[in-house]
Amino acid sequence: MSLNKAPAGLFASSIVFIFFILTSGCAGDCSRQQKEREFTIDLSEDSIEDLMRVKKIFYSLPSPLETAMLLKSSGAVYNEELLNPVENVSRYLTNRSMALNLGIYTTNLSYASLFDQAQTCMDYMDATRRLADNLGILDAVDSYTIERLEENINNREVILDIVSENFMNSSSFLQENNREPVAAMMLTGGWIEGLYLALGQVDENELENNRLVRMITDKKLSLEIVMLMLENNSHNSDVADLKADMEKIENIFREVDVHSSPVEVTQSGDETVAVLRSATVSNISRDVFRQLKSTVTDLRNSFVS
């Protein structure tokens, strides 16, 4: 890839690679004719209900790409000093450290791609590939998938739909191969990194009417999903330890007020249809913000060290 390509080309190239990582063994088994593989599995009704519940939890979390897009739309600017240096990749030798930092690096890659950082994207592609390969979840993307992405090179919404769909397939692949703990740690790493990047760009003296602060406080809602996901996989000692770490953040978020505003009734253009409107309102004090930023920074730095 040329460093002089247009921003749209850089974005699509990065998305192809993010897709490559997140399909995690799914896309490589699909051909242009969409061949189907059949499995015969005996599941009780309780097992099926458990599987659907777990999938609902995994799918409720934003992908690293969605997190990066939310950061940018909330007013974040590019700051490479906030990223986990790619030189650290050789440190990650355990399943826990590799899974957490796969989530972290994938979020870094998404963030860099949205700000058109060509060389940085290539560096993070390599680091992410190494971790995914070491975890045994790397597979090739077939030519049909790449063609679909290239056909929509200038349509970020379509690209996001494709990536999000296959991010869910990634979680399914890990679950169906009894690797839910790896998926849980990977998703938690990405969640923490998104919060860390947002916190790193907010001045504690400018909390009022700040879109990034709104993004940060809204994380309280998705944290409930993260904690439930970790609880469901706490039979794994690595996940149990991670859950204990995340409880520190959960305790701080209890001090953050997030609620829905009163419902307002307005008329549509038709005047025969009433439209109900409500917004999420949040508030965080300076002291709580400081505590949250300090705790998240310490925890995230322990993940990447």
Please report, for each region that a protein language model flagged, where it lies by residue.
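Secondary-structure edge/capping motif, primarily at the C-terminal ends of alpha-helices
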Residues: 109-116, 135, 139, 174-177, ...
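A cross-kingdom marker for long, charged
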Residues: 229-305
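Non-transmembrane, amphipathic alpha-helical segments
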Residues: 90-97, 109-116, 120, 148-151, ...
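Extended amphipathic alpha-helical interaction segments
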Residues: 155-243
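C-terminal motif of bacterial Sec signal peptides marking the signal peptidase cleavage site
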Residues: 22-25
